[in-house]
Amino acid sequence: MGRQRQQRSRGSRSRRRVRKNISTAVVHIKSSFNNTIISVTDQEGNVIAWESAGSMGFKGSRKSTPYAAQMTAESAANKAMEHGVKRVDIQVKGHGSGRDMAARTFQAMGIEVLSIKDVTGQPHNGCRPPKRRRG
């Protein structure tokens, strides 16, 4: 008379990373006032690797520091080099404090930087900006 429970198979989904062999990639660095997100893509825009300061273990206000951006860029560069990336074009977006440090870290890791381009959007008188902080 008891209700029978259905057993769900909890098969482990093994995420296997397919090793691509890409020599030239595009690095997208989005640096906001709260976090730094780095995505490494191929020329078509398919993501090879990504990393953010939050996923690296930085919490709260430490995510927006240049040091967090440097560690995030090192981890993203290592993941990209596993796929054979030797040269990168860097696209920087945002006004955060980690944008310069992240771009410099890719050069320090031994990856040849072909170009650095700022793709931060400029509003054509769009949304009203937030009011100034008091203090």
From Swiss-Prot:
GO molecular function, one term: rRNA binding
Record key words, sorted: Ribonucleoprotein, Ribosomal protein, RNA-binding, rRNA-binding
Recorded GO CC terms: ribonucleoprotein complex; ribosome
Top-level taxon of origin: Bacteria
Region (Disordered): 1-20
Record carries keyword Manganese: no
InterPro entries assigned to the protein according to its UniProt record, in alphabetical order: Ribosomal_uS11, Ribosomal_uS11_bac-type, Ribosomal_uS11_sf
Ribonucleoprotein as UniProt keyword: yes
SUPFAM superfamilies for this protein: Translational machinery components
Record GO biological process: translation
Classification via Pfam families: Ribosomal_S11
Role description: Located on the platform of the 30S subunit, it bridges several disparate RNA helices of the 16S rRNA. Forms part of the Shine-Dalgarno cleft in the 70S ribosome.
HAMAP family, per database record: Ribosomal_uS11 (MF_01310)
Entry similarity comment: Belongs to the universal ribosomal protein uS11 family.
Subunit structure, interactors included: Part of the 30S ribosomal subunit. Interacts with proteins S7 and S18. Binds to IF-3.
Protein name: Small ribosomal subunit protein uS11
Lineage summary: Bacteria, Bacillati, Actinomycetota, Rubrobacteria, Rubrobacterales
Annotated gene: rpsK
